[in-house]
Amino acid sequence: KEGMNSIELLALNTDAQHLLNTPIPHRMLIGKQLTKGLGAGSEPGTGEGAAEEARVELLEACQDADIIFLTGGLGGGTGTGSLPVIARLAKEKGALTIAIVTLPFSNEGARRTRNARLGLEKLRKSADTVIVIPNDKLLQDDIMNLPLNLAFRHADEILGNAIKCMTEITSHGGLVNIDFADMRSIMDGGGVAMIGMGEGQGANRASDAVIAALTSPLLELDIAESKGALVNVTGGDDMTLQE
């Protein structure tokens, strides 16, 4: 939520208690009849049914949106099952639909891994572009020993930063502007995408940031084979033309 003032946020869930604890003012409980507000029980079919049940409300939520970002974790019931349905409905309303999803840690079990794989296949067919963040790729030395809840929070922060980067490209005027049409030309029908982020400080901050982004553990694909790329560079007032 932090730093996302330029976009409207909507939290969806099949679990009423979990939704109640979500720090987002706009919320929607889906699958009220199907799940009775008790969650999807790690069953993607239940999550899919919940989204279909809320079809009218979801279409209304997508009304007049130019671009819709869908975020969630694959592997469970609600996210895995509902995201492909919501992506399809968003596209029906003409919105550019970008899904940013996390894949489960390998130690979360074979069932969640299998669910995530099947859910990703469906999502690829529904969304314009799917940005995949494998949680296992986040297991760097500096977070390996974190408590599990903090490790999940770290994954959520990466996901949030990815959204903020893309919204900044079109919603905040820069020295080199990229408008919505530019983004659509790259992301419309873009398939699966990866994201890399880097920061730099000191005398070599520009090159350090580029190297960090290009060697990000989140980049599993060879970028030389990419059909397109969105690049967002942010710096202070002292950033030079050479940088």
What are these regions (language model features)?
Residues 1-243:
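Tubulin/FtsZ superfamily GTPase core signature
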